[in-house]
Protein backbone atom coordinates (compact mmCIF):
# COMPACT_ATOMS: atom_id res chain seq x y z
CA UNK A 1 0.00 0.00 0.00
CA UNK A 2 1.47 3.33 -1.05
CA UNK A 3 1.43 6.41 1.09
CA UNK A 4 -0.92 9.28 0.32
CA UNK A 5 1.92 11.62 -0.63
CA UNK A 6 3.07 9.25 -3.37
CA UNK A 7 -0.47 8.86 -4.66
CA UNK A 8 -0.89 12.65 -4.74
CA UNK A 9 2.41 13.11 -6.60
CA UNK A 10 1.49 10.42 -9.10
CA UNK A 11 -1.97 11.93 -9.61
CA UNK A 12 -0.47 15.35 -10.31
CA UNK A 13 2.00 13.81 -12.76
CA UNK A 14 -0.78 11.89 -14.54
CA UNK A 15 -2.80 15.10 -14.81
CA UNK A 16 0.12 16.83 -16.52
CA UNK A 17 0.84 13.90 -18.83
CA UNK A 18 -2.79 13.43 -19.92
CA UNK A 19 -3.32 17.17 -20.48
CA UNK A 20 -0.22 17.49 -22.63
CA UNK A 21 -1.02 14.26 -24.52
CA UNK A 22 -4.50 15.52 -25.36
CA UNK A 23 -3.01 18.79 -26.55
CA UNK A 24 -0.09 17.35 -28.56
CA UNK A 25 -0.53 13.65 -29.35
CA UNK A 26 -4.25 12.93 -29.68
CA UNK A 27 -5.55 14.25 -32.99
CA UNK A 28 -9.27 14.42 -32.30
CA UNK A 29 -11.13 17.68 -32.85
CA UNK A 30 -13.68 16.74 -30.19
CA UNK A 31 -10.95 17.12 -27.56
CA UNK A 32 -10.01 20.71 -28.53
CA UNK A 33 -11.99 22.26 -25.69
CA UNK A 34 -11.35 19.61 -23.02
CA UNK A 35 -9.45 20.66 -19.91
CA UNK A 36 -8.11 18.15 -17.40
CA UNK A 37 -8.95 19.61 -13.98
CA UNK A 38 -7.97 16.92 -11.48
CA UNK A 39 -6.84 13.32 -11.03
CA UNK A 40 -7.45 11.12 -8.01
CA UNK A 41 -5.60 7.87 -7.33
CA UNK A 42 -6.60 4.83 -5.35
CA UNK A 43 -4.38 3.84 -2.45
CA UNK A 44 -2.90 0.88 -4.33
CA UNK A 45 -1.99 3.14 -7.31
CA UNK A 46 -3.82 0.85 -9.74
CA UNK A 47 -6.69 3.17 -10.70
CA UNK A 48 -6.73 6.85 -11.57
CA UNK A 49 -9.90 8.88 -12.04
CA UNK A 50 -9.35 11.78 -14.44
CA UNK A 51 -11.74 14.72 -14.09
CA UNK A 52 -12.29 17.01 -17.05
CA UNK A 53 -14.37 19.98 -18.15
CA UNK A 54 -15.53 20.90 -21.63
CA UNK A 55 -16.23 24.38 -22.90
CA UNK A 56 -17.94 25.48 -26.08
CA UNK A 57 -16.19 27.05 -29.07
CA UNK A 58 -17.57 30.41 -27.94
CA UNK A 59 -19.19 31.78 -24.80
CA UNK A 60 -22.69 31.45 -26.27
CA UNK A 61 -22.15 27.90 -27.52
CA UNK A 62 -22.95 24.96 -25.27
CA UNK A 63 -20.19 22.36 -24.83
CA UNK A 64 -20.65 18.97 -26.48
CA UNK A 65 -20.17 16.74 -23.44
CA UNK A 66 -21.18 13.50 -25.17
CA UNK A 67 -18.70 13.95 -28.03
CA UNK A 68 -15.88 14.74 -25.59
CA UNK A 69 -16.73 11.69 -23.48
CA UNK A 70 -16.78 9.49 -26.59
CA UNK A 71 -13.44 10.89 -27.79
CA UNK A 72 -11.82 10.26 -24.39
CA UNK A 73 -13.27 6.75 -24.36
CA UNK A 74 -11.82 6.04 -27.80
CA UNK A 75 -8.40 7.46 -26.84
CA UNK A 76 -8.15 5.78 -23.43
CA UNK A 77 -5.75 3.05 -24.59
CA UNK A 78 -3.43 5.49 -26.31
CA UNK A 79 -3.52 7.81 -23.29
CA UNK A 80 -2.75 4.92 -20.92
CA UNK A 81 0.20 3.91 -23.10
CA UNK A 82 1.56 7.49 -23.04
CA UNK A 83 1.07 7.68 -19.26
CA UNK A 84 2.89 4.35 -18.83
CA UNK A 85 5.82 5.46 -20.96
CA UNK A 86 6.26 8.79 -19.19
CA UNK A 87 5.41 7.71 -15.64
CA UNK A 88 8.07 5.02 -15.34
CA UNK A 89 6.32 2.76 -12.83
CA UNK A 90 5.93 -1.00 -12.86
CA UNK A 91 2.14 -0.92 -13.20
CA UNK A 92 0.40 1.72 -15.31
CA UNK A 93 -2.83 2.74 -13.60
CA UNK A 94 -6.16 2.23 -15.30
CA UNK A 95 -7.59 5.58 -16.37
CA UNK A 96 -11.29 6.36 -16.00
CA UNK A 97 -12.75 9.68 -17.10
CA UNK A 98 -15.43 11.65 -15.31
CA UNK A 99 -16.93 15.05 -16.08
CA UNK A 100 -16.01 17.61 -13.42
CA UNK A 101 -19.15 19.25 -12.05
CA UNK A 102 -17.35 21.72 -9.78
CA UNK A 103 -17.55 24.69 -12.22
CA UNK A 104 -21.31 24.25 -12.68
CA UNK A 105 -21.85 23.82 -8.95
CA UNK A 106 -19.80 26.92 -8.16
CA UNK A 107 -21.71 28.94 -10.77
CA UNK A 108 -24.97 27.81 -9.15
CA UNK A 109 -23.66 28.80 -5.70
CA UNK A 110 -22.61 32.21 -7.04
CA UNK A 111 -26.12 32.73 -8.44
CA UNK A 112 -27.64 31.82 -5.06
CA UNK A 113 -25.28 34.16 -3.22
CA UNK A 114 -26.04 36.96 -5.68
CA UNK A 115 -29.77 36.47 -5.10
CA UNK A 116 -29.22 36.59 -1.32
CA UNK A 117 -27.17 39.80 -1.63
CA UNK A 118 -29.94 41.47 -3.66
CA UNK A 119 -32.53 40.43 -1.09
CA UNK A 120 -30.33 41.82 1.71
CA UNK A 121 -30.09 45.15 -0.16
CA UNK A 122 -33.89 45.26 -0.51
CA UNK A 123 -34.33 44.60 3.20
CA UNK A 124 -31.78 47.29 4.07
CA UNK A 125 -33.72 49.83 1.99
CA UNK A 126 -36.96 48.86 3.74
CA UNK A 127 -35.26 49.13 7.12
CA UNK A 128 -34.05 52.70 6.49
CA UNK A 129 -37.50 54.30 6.75
CA UNK A 130 -38.86 51.96 9.40
CA UNK A 131 -39.79 53.04 12.91
CA UNK A 132 -40.45 50.86 15.97
CA UNK A 133 -44.06 49.68 16.30
CA UNK A 134 -44.37 50.77 19.93
CA UNK A 135 -42.25 52.84 22.23
CA UNK A 136 -38.61 53.36 21.42
CA UNK A 137 -37.62 50.97 24.24
CA UNK A 138 -40.44 48.50 24.98
CA UNK A 139 -38.51 46.67 27.69
CA UNK A 140 -39.10 47.49 31.34
CA UNK A 141 -36.16 49.15 33.03
CA UNK A 142 -35.62 50.01 36.64
CA UNK A 143 -37.44 53.25 37.34
CA UNK A 144 -37.22 55.77 40.17
CA UNK A 145 -40.41 54.48 41.79
CA UNK A 146 -38.91 51.03 42.29
CA UNK A 147 -35.68 52.41 43.71
CA UNK A 148 -37.58 54.67 46.16
CA UNK A 149 -39.47 51.76 47.70
Swiss-Prot record:
Location of the region described as Disordered in the Swiss-Prot/TrEMBL record: 123-149
Protein's UniProt keywords contain Cell inner membrane: no
UniProt entry keywords in alphabetical sequence: Cytoplasm, Ribosome biogenesis
Gene Ontology biological process terms in this record: maturation of SSU-rRNA
Keyword Cytoplasm tagged: yes
Gene3D superfamilies recorded: 3.30.300.20
GO MF, one example: ribosomal small subunit binding
SUPFAM superfamilies: Ribosome-binding factor A, RbfA
GO CC, alphabetical: cytosol
Complex formation: Monomer. Binds 30S ribosomal subunits, but not 50S ribosomal subunits or 70S ribosomes.
Family the entry assigns: Belongs to the RbfA family.
Name of this chain's protein: Ribosome-binding factor A
Amino acid sequence: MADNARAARMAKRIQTIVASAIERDIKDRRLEFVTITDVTMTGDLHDAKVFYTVRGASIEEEPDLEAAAEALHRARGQLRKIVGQQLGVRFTPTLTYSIDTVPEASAHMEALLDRARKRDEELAKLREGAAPAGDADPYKTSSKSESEE
